[in-house]
């Protein structure tokens, strides 16, 4: 069972600094990923952002810390904390790197992402938990999979142990008392509640 201390009022209102929920949307809601290669390239860029190195292969301080991500077909969710640069500069860095790859591969020049950056400041633990849960539940809500663990292109697989090498996310969350197992329980509990609600609705409809 998820620790009650995580959901207490005091914990939910704990202030966080420099954390943002970023959504990178495709221009005119068009797709930004066409196949597995595109998605793997984007994840490679995220690794370079969170684990940068100089020309000699010496590790550098991260541009940002990523706590969650989800690669949908026409948009991307990222939950991040600012590192050596501001959030907008980091997102621009990610965007430019992926656009260069995408344009070269498909020989195109049209806009790929919307010019306006969609982001919300995550200023307390309560909203952090909501964002963490929402991002990992995105493929389930979209009807792509029945469980977050079945979606290949989100950070949930890092938290549940399906991926244990070349991880992008920091699993040390910006507050105490919550580990990877707690994150999985928090996210999956929503799926269970949704399934229960659907079963209840179907039962009621049969009775009417």
Regions found by a protein language model. Give the residues of each.
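Short Pro-Cys-Gly-centered "Cys-loop" motif that presents a nucleophilic cysteine in a tight turn
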Residues: 1-68, 72-73, 81-208
């Amino acid at each position: 069972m998820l620790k009650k201390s995580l959901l207490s009022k005091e914990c939910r209102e704990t202030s966080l600094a420099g954390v943002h929920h970023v959504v990178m949307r495709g221009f005119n809601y068009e797709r930004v990923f066409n196949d597995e290669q595109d998605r793997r390239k984007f994840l490679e860029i995220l690794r370079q952002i969170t684990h940068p190195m100089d020309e000699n292969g010496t590790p550098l301080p991260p541009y940002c810390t990523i706590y969650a991500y989800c690669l949908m077909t026409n948009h991307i969710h990222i939950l991040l904390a600012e590192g050596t640069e501001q959030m907008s500069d980091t997102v621009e860095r990610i965007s430019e790197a992926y656009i260069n790859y995408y344009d070269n591969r498909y020989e195109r020049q049209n806009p790929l992402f919307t010019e306006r950056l969609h982001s919300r400041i995550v200023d307390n633990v309560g909203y952090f938990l909501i964002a963490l849960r929402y991002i990992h539940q995105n493929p389930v809500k979209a009807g792509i999979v029945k469980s977050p663990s079945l979606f290949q292109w989100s950070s949930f697989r890092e938290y549940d142990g399906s991926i244990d090498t070349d991880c992008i996310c920091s699993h040390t969350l910006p507050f105490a008392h919550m580990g990877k197992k707690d994150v999985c329980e928090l996210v999956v509990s929503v799926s269970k509640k949704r399934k229960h609600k659907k079963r209840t609705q179907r039962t009621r409809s049969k009775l009417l």
